[in-house]
């Protein structure tokens, strides 16, 4: 968010932060859905439903037809295509949010993130992905095992670095 009295690099850094935050929110949330399918936390049907819910029926059908036309038979490849479609859609939504709120952004009165200002269909689908991520993905055994491994690696590295620094 732009802050009154800021100019030049300071203003650019705040705007850049908002753009990076939107990209981060989009990629991590949608990639978590894709990864949960690969880890078999979510079924293909659940994953397809979540990803296609970002689009109206007409676009959903076009995506399904494109998957057929491209002869994608592997479920993971289908999910990759749907994930890429969702990320592209959300990028365009954030651009639209930026353009719709450009005056507020420049005046320093813009509130929230770009994700907060996307269209209702996409916002509802995004919130559903967040809900599923918290209820099913982040609490699942495979994800917790990976997280625990990461903590163990960090603890080992800290011990090695501290030992090296002390000696």
Set out the residue ranges of the language-model regions.
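Histidine-centered, transition-metal-coordinating active-site segments
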Residues: 1-167
